[in-house]
């Protein structure tokens, strides 16, 4: 795995990959809206790999450490290097723990697609295949919808929130929700707030006595928000439990409700043809 970010600080490569509580995300200004703060994942992969190699390139220098089953085998020390900044990680799962393991691209591919949908402009390469998105969550709906939308996908975005909405002839509702880039397959407080706020805004726009269930029937939508220090209902992080967007912020329900009240209502007023089809 190779990326081209800033790179791990060269004197911290060993600590970051082997010592607990050495995550780089405690500075709230830089990483306040992350999924995890502690950097546990990389240590777990290291401990459960028969071989693990990590190298960081930064400002013309590099440093690397090799491990076997979590134990240091060798360290390169600082060496000159002309590679672009960023880390490189290579690992082989421990066959005594993961017997007959195999990488399944059909499971990896949806994760990578979601990453590019949530980070417009990001490019990810996997075994020669390229994943890229120019239109964010609009591309996500176009990728995953199994029926044609009845009207052009409504795309709304603001600080720490992105929303797409449309309807189709399918029965029921279909939602995709994300928090800080994490796909919350079980929803949570943000999805509950979105469903309520979207239907309320649509009902108020038309000023008709619609049932909420009728408004949501056939709705296909996605929402992505960023929350400071998110709380999930389990370690799998598939359902958001946070009530507020941050220690000093509004509730998630108010944040999403206020955004949709303004932006979705404005959109429907400005796009009469879409509003007519939705009706």
Show which residues each predicted segment covers.
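Short acidic-aromatic loop segments in the C-terminal HATPase_c
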Residues: 17-21
